[in-house]
Amino acid sequence: SLRVNLSDMAAMGARPIFYNLSISIPKKKAKNFIPKFAKGLCEDQEFFGIKLIGGDLTSSLQDINITITIFGETLNKNSVTRDGAKSGDLLFVSGVLGLSKIGLDNFYSKSKKFDSAKKKYLLPEPRVNLGLSINKIANSMIDISDGLIQDACHLAKNSNLSIVIDIEKVPLPSFINLKKDLLLDAALYGGDDYELLFSCRPTHEKALKNISIEKSIDLTHVGFFQDFHEDYIILKNY
């Protein structure tokens, strides 16, 4: 739950500072759940440089409910929103897409080939450092929680533009014995990847290549923005 909130910070090009946490949990589950949950939080707090400053712990009848409010800061007061794209901008995405959906679909498989996918599903990696690095390059950005198509549509709608996505350029995970159509469907519609999807001017493409090398994160040019025409999302080579 903390990592999902950290991904929201990353999508704004912001640095997370601290957070509040509220947990509602049945008493019979607290003894087993709380120590493990606290251990995971402490590890993430240290790794991402964020502190817990307050919150609340209450008892519930049945379900475990977790609410997090996160606070951060932007560089030079420059936060990236979802509505800054211009016609002619390029569309980039970090990492590979569809891995989390593959992990979910094969969660109970005993095959070790799905271990990385399961980890991606259970423990998403918020791209906080990447978001900070492209803060002045990206002019609109979102983290992919609902799949490439739906989240790209959010960017297109907010800027009142169409996005042309080249299906052949979408970065897919590599799995032997899984058909490309299945991998592509997971990437386009699966969600929970928490990679960054963003727009930038064509003149920034070289700078992004340098950032990709520096951060050891693949940044793939998957499409471009154009004046709105009929649909928000246009798929090429589909």
Set out the residue ranges of the language-model regions.
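Gly/Ser/Thr-rich helix-start
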Residues: 14, 55-56, 73, 85, ...
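A generic local structural motif
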Residues: 54, 78-79, 128-129, 182-185
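Active-site-proximal beta-alpha loop/turn segments in soluble metabolic enzymes
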Residues: 22-27, 107, 113-115, 193
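Glycine-rich phosphate/pyrophosphate-binding loop regions near the starts of catalytic domains
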Residues: 1-93
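Catalytic-loop motifs flanking and including active-site residues across diverse enzymes
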Residues: 1, 130, 148
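A short alpha-helix capping/helix-coil boundary motif
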Residues: 17-23, 109-110, 130-133, 186-188
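Short, acidic (Asp/Glu-rich) active-site segment that either coordinates a divalent metal cofactor
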Residues: 65, 80-132
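Glycine-/charge-enriched secondary-structure boundary and capping motifs
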Residues: 27-53, 59-66, 71, 136-137, ...
